[in-house]
């Protein structure tokens, strides 16, 4: 066991995490040159295209060190994005060490810091590495200074390397072996294995990626999953050297996969503990928690007959993504669809993109909303994740909205514009500190303001230099109201939004004005109103198209003209009673683009 090293790689998006993983795998001969491809651990197309890692992957490699010993290195690839922070913490708790990869030309960024703190809290040994030193604009000394300032770990002996050219990668592995402790654990104790990740395979069912902490996991063992209490028979165990290789057993300290004929991903939850039925472990490994969705949106098929197909696609996606939640919902405006819950905005975009790309769905998405807690007058508390389900304002005692702590990093010349943005979004400043040329700002901002367009606005006010990450803090009472949009005095449920009262007038006017541009003219007047409860706060009219009924009266008597105009008016009135206004597709997207002032 002294020769095992379990480690993962922490880095901000595009700092070269996957490329470094490729080089390490190549050096250790995990794959032949023919099988080697760029970003070998990112198996989804969408991961390669966006350059992000979504699911955790592993590689068990053997490396002959300079001291002549052969070491088993288990590389556990982690996602880097905040939406997947729970998956990151599970991957990290399966390791004893982590390589902190920092781009020498860019310095420390927000998500690196967030994941690095997670690692330090879990007691993982962090080994700093400076990547991209082959770039002409690389500034290693500045990067070392930033690591020490911002993260607060000693980085004087940070290993410089270039994952692209392969220079210095061997030094990185040597530093890793020297600094990272071997795993602790007792191979004869009752089995405890941590599920790092799980995914669905069409042939064998659910494949679980596990790190054995104590005990030994053999094929034909009967195992118990402690969080769900379900029992299964192990069919095969093995390791990935990115390719899967079967073994007879996994012992303490090793990382590998387990296949036990599980049909549903819900049974194998990330962070759960596996133990054997014969010799049960006393307690599960710490740190397991159910993942709760933070952002909700409605997904509707464009064609009503695609509803079943959408349900199937969502079911298939859920096989590989246990944190996706959905339930059927009906909207008068959009017909049948689903209310889906996501971990965050990136997660939502990825799910939408995969539905469109892998399953050929055409979707309409309603504006993303967060979960509000509503305290009623009768003392009960309701959670509301869909604006259309908000109870009657007369019965509400208080509404609590989720507040998140946002950490922002940016060069100091952009501080002013970022602070202005945060203030617009009802943020309160908690902290501000300077690290060399970088500034770290900490704000508490209502989550509802972040899901709309905060990230895009942040990138545009800072020209792409600011980076951020956020985590949920608490629910706080807030003066928010539901703004309904009425078209010819009919509520359109899919257009309702929940906004802060101070912003509601403006928001109502903007949406009404936007609708007026989008809704085509009908044969009768269309009134577009924005209302809070029964108070109308804004109104726009779409004028009717009308025929010139007086064209045939040449000169003519005034009473004759009046008669024709009255007749036209009566006809329009009748049409208005029976006519319904078709709301075009763009109207639902337009809601997303209404900027706050």
Swiss-Prot record:
InterPro entries: EF-4 (IPR006297), EFG_III/V (IPR035647), EFG_V-like (IPR000640), EFTu-like_2 (IPR004161), G_TR_CS (IPR031157), LepA_C_sf (IPR038363), LepA_CTD (IPR013842), LepA_IV (IPR035654). Gene3D superfamilies: 3.30.70.240, Elongation factor 4, C-terminal domain (3.30.70.2570), Elongation Factor G (Translational Gtpase), domain 3 (3.30.70.870), P-loop containing nucleotide triphosphate hydrolases (3.40.50.300), Translation factors (2.40.30.10). Residues 2-184 form the tr-type G domain. It holds the Pfam family GTP_EFTU_D2. One of its GO terms (molecular function) is guanosine tetraphosphate binding. It catalyses: GTP + H2O = GDP + phosphate + H(+). GO terms for cellular component: plasma membrane. Its EC number is 3.6.5.n1. It comes from the Bacteria. GTP binds at residues 14-19, 131-134. It is an enzyme of class 3 (hydrolase). GO terms for biological process: positive regulation of translation. Belongs to the TRAFAC class translation factor GTPase superfamily. Classic translation factor GTPase family. LepA subfamily. This is Elongation factor 4. It comes from Cupriavidus taiwanensis (strain DSM 17343 / BCRC 17206 / CCUG 44338 / CIP 107171 / LMG 19424 / R1).
């Amino acid at each position: 066991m002294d020769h095992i090293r379990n480690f993962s790689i922490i880095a901000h998006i595009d700092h070269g995490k996957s490329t470094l993983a490729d080089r390490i795998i190549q050096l250790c001969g995990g794959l032949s040159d023919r099988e080697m491809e760029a970003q070998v651990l990112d198996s989804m197309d969408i991961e390669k295209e966006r350059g992000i890692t979504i699911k955790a992957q592993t590689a068990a490699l053997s490396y002959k060190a300079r001291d002549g010993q052969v070491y088993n290195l288990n590389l556990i690839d982690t996602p880097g994005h905040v939406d997947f922070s729970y998956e990151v913490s599970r991957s990290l708790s399966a390791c004893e060490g982590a390589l902190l990869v920092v781009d020498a030309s860019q310095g420390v960024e927000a998500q690196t810091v967030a994941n690095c703190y997670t690692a330090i809290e879990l007691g993982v040994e962090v080994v700093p590495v400076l990547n991209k030193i082959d770039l002409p604009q690389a500034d290693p000394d500045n990067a070392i200074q930033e690591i020490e300032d911002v993260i607060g770990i000693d980085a004087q002996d940070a290993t410089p390397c270039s994952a692209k050219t392969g220079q210095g990668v061997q030094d990185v592995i040597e530093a890793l072996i020297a600094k990272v402790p071997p795993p602790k654990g007792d191979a004869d104790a009752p089995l405890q294995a941590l599920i790092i990740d799980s995914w669905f395979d069409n042939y064998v069912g659910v494949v679980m990626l596990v790190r054995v902490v104590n005990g030994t996991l053999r094929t034909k063992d009967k195992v118990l999953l402690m969080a769900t209490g379900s029992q299964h028979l192990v069919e095969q165990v093995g390791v990935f050297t990115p390719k899967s290789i079967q073994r007879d057993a996994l012992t303490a300290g090793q990382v590998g996969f387990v296949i036990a004929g599980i049909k549903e991903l819900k049974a194998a939850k990330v962070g759960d503990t596996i133990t054997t039925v014969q010799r049960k472990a006393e307690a599960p490994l710490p740190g397991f928690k159910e993942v709760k969705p933070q952002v909700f949106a409605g997904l509707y098929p464009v064609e009503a007959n695609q509803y079943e197909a959408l349900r199937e696609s969502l079911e298939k996606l859920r096989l590989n993504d246990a944190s996706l939640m959905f339930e059927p919902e009906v909207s008068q405006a959009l017909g049948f669809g689903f209310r889906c819950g996501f971990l965050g905005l990136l997660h939502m975009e990825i799910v939408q993109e995969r539905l469109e790309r892998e399953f050929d769905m055409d979707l309409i998405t309603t504006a993303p909303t967060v979960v509000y807690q509503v305290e009623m007058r009768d003392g009960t508390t309701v959670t509301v994740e869909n604006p259309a389900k908000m109870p009657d304002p007369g019965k509400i005692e208080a509404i609590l909205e989720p507040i998140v702590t946002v950490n922002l990093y940016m060069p100091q010349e952009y501080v002013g514009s970022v602070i202005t943005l945060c203030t617009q979004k009802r943020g309160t400043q908690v902290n501000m500190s300077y690290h060399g040329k970088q500034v770290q700002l900490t704000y508490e901002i209502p989550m509802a303001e972040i899901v709309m367009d905060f990230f895009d606005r942040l990138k545009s006010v800072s020209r792409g230099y600011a980076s951020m990450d956020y985590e949920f803090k608490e629910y706080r009472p807030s003066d928010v109201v539901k703004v309904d949009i009425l078209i010819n005095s009919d509520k359109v449920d899919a257009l309702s939004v929940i906004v802060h009262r101070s912003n509601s007038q403006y928001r109502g006017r903007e949406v009404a004005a936007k609708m007026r541009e989008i809704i085509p003219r009908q044969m009768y007047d269309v009134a577009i109103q924005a209302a809070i409860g029964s108070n109308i706060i804004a109104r726009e009219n779409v004028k009717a198209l009308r025929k010139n009924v007086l064209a045939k009266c040449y000169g003519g008597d005034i009473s004759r003209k009046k008669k024709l105009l009255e007749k036209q008016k009566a006809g329009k009135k009748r049409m208005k009673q029976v006519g319904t206004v078709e709301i075009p597709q763009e109207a639902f997207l337009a809601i997303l683009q209404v900027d706050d002032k």
